[in-house]
Amino acid sequence: MASLRIGMTTLDRLGFSAARGIERHLSARLGSRRTEGLETTAESLGILDALSPTEQDQLVATAIRDARTAPTRITQLAQAWHEGDAPKLDALLREGFKEFPQLRKRLIDDRNAAWLPKIRSLLKGSENAIVIVGSGHLAGPDSLVDLLAKEGVSLTQQEHTTRRTAPATP
């Protein structure tokens, strides 16, 4: 959990706040409409808790070591996301997980596979649905986009109607 706190502190310093995230924005717009998660908070945090003590120590050491370069990487990730540049986003994410391929598998790939049945169910429903996931789940060969396309789901990347520049690197 210490590595998560280090990462969240860096994000907060750069102006990326959960209070200003897309989930809060859409929740306010949706009002009393039904919402549900693809997983619980406990399930997502459980992924980090399931790491061995050695893996947790390595993750904390890496977070501390990379604290100086994290703002630049985060800004690059945000820019790739805002530009809709999936290949660049995938390359940046893979670079970030280079030292921890098993963590990427657990945090991204395994969760994508686990979420597919729920997303399939939403797509078959009669109501409109919005699925919100982190950007790491949207790019690459095991992304939700790729997995859904393999199942024949037609996806269209939407253009931003407004552009927000990524926060400046301190």
Residue ranges and their predicted role:
Residues M1-L103, L107:
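Structured, acidic catalytic/metal-binding patches in enzyme active sites
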Residues K105-P170:
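C-terminal soluble interaction/assembly domains
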